Structures are given as C-alpha cells and as structure tokens.
C-alpha cells in the first residue's frame, strides 16, 4: 500500500517540531528538526530488510516493466520504502516514485522510475539497496507524480524528465556512464561527497532536516522517529551533497530567494 498522509494527520506531527542550530559545509546548509511524534509505526527500512534476506525486489516478470517492480515481504512487520530511494540491479536501476509501506507477509508492486537510461538487460536476478536521489531530481519527480496521483490515482512520473535530470547531473559534474546511470555520478564523485558527509554528521535527536543549497531552499525530510533519520543519514546526505556539487559546478544558476529560514517561518 502507498503511504500518502493527509494534511489533517500531519498537523499534530508538525506542531511538535523544534528548530535546531544550523550547520553547513561549503554551499550546503542543514537545519535539524526535533520533537516527539504522536504514535509509532512498527516498520523496518527496505534497505535493512533486503540485507536481512526478508525482502526481495525483482522485475514484475522476465520481460520487466519500467514503472513497476515486484516486492515480496517475508518479514513479520511492515517495510518502508522511501521516496527517491535507489534500487540497483536486475534490468535497470530504479528509484521510488513515492514512499511506500508494504504490509507484513505480503506481495505487491511498487511505483518506480528508471535512473539508468541505457541498460535494459539483467545484471542480477533481483535488486539491492543503492543510494538516494538528489533533491532536485526528487522535486521534479514529485511534481509530476503529484499531478498523476490527482488525475489518475497512480504514482507515475514523467520518465523523460527523470532521465533529463540524471543527464543534467552528469553534465554538471563531468561524470560519465555508458548507461547514463545515476549511481555512476555518485561513485565518480565519492571523494567530494565524503567531504560533505564528514563535515555534516547526523545531528543527535533530529527526526527531520531542512536543507538549503547555495542559499536556496532545497528540501525538507521528516520522519516519525530519530532512529529512522539516523539510519538513512549517510544515503540521504549523499543526495543533498550531489545537488550541492552540481550547484558549485553550474555557475549559470541564479540565486533563489527562498532560503531555509524563510521556509521555516
């Protein structure tokens, strides 16, 4: 089932938030968000479930289908896939179109987008957890997914726009991939990305973070508990840092007026 909380259910969740002290490195600024969440869901993260061998993600058939993957959850608790989370392997790498909670002991399909335009052949029988999408790609994808959700009830992206975003990342960073894989941009910039990760460790107790890049608002990510954010911090940060590197390399980007403090007011 897809996890799409309504505004009414989010209000008490947001009301408890407290804004922490900002921290930054080069052109990336993070403001931690702390506070208690009402209630707790019993779930495990998809990456952990895959590593534990209780969750399998495959193509929906031998022939495959670009916008969907098959999930078999053998765990006794729900499994959470995160919006923008990357899955690598099978016929081509994908990212989640939206956050999804998969019921215990169940099988389902999840909505995804391709982030490896030049491959449609098996590299492995199933998928492993990868990195996390940069916030620019997530924002573009989310706008398109939101439109199709309202119009059709289905979480479908504009696949061409996703490929354009991945190509723009490679162009800005000077990275190269024969299959135009987003993952290759991350691998080829690993030293620079690690500089951001080392300078910006997980802020203890935070269950959310507000992000700005080069002075412009980029993203807010918020979770029901600090443990979830801490667990995915390095992958989430890699996505933010990739956007920050793109901004450093693209001198033509105009400054945006909406910074972190403006958004949090």
Model-flagged regions — what are they?
Residues 3, 7-12, 16-25, 29, ...:
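Intrinsically disordered, low-complexity Pro/Gly/Ser/Thr-rich segments with frequent PxxP/GP/PP motifs
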């Amino acid at each position: 089932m897809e996890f799409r909380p309504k505004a009414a259910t989010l209000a008490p969740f947001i009301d408890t938030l407290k804004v922490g002290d900002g921290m930054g490195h080069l052109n990336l600024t993070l403001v931690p968000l702390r506070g208690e969440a009402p209630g707790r869901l019993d779930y495990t993260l998809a990456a952990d479930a895959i590593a534990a061998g209780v969750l399998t993600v495959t193509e929906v058939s031998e022939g495959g289908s670009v916008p969907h993957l098959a999930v078999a959850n053998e765990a006794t608790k729900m499994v959470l896939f995160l919006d923008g989370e990357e899955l690598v392997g099978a016929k081509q790498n994908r990212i989640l179109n939206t956050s999804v909670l998969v019921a215990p002991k169940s099988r389902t399909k999840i909505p995804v987008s391709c982030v490896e335009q030049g491959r449609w052949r098996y590299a492995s029988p199933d998928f492993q957890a990868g990195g996390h999408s940069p916030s620019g790609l997530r924002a573009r994808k989310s706008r398109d997914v939101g439109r199709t959700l309202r119009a059709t009830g289905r979480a479908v992206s504009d696949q061409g726009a996703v490929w354009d975003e991945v190509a723009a990342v490679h162009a800005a960073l000077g990275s190269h991939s024969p299959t135009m894989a987003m993952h290759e941009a991350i691998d080829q910039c690993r030293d620079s990305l690690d500089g951001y990760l080392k300078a910006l460790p997980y802020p203890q107790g935070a269950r959310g973070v507000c992000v700005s890049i080069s002075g412009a608002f980029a993203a807010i990510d918020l979770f029901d508990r600090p443990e979830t954010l801490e667990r995915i911090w390095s992958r989430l940060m890699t996505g933010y840092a990739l956007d920050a590197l793109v901004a450093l390399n693209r001198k033509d980007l105009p400054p945006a007026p909406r910074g972190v403090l403006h958004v949090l007011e």
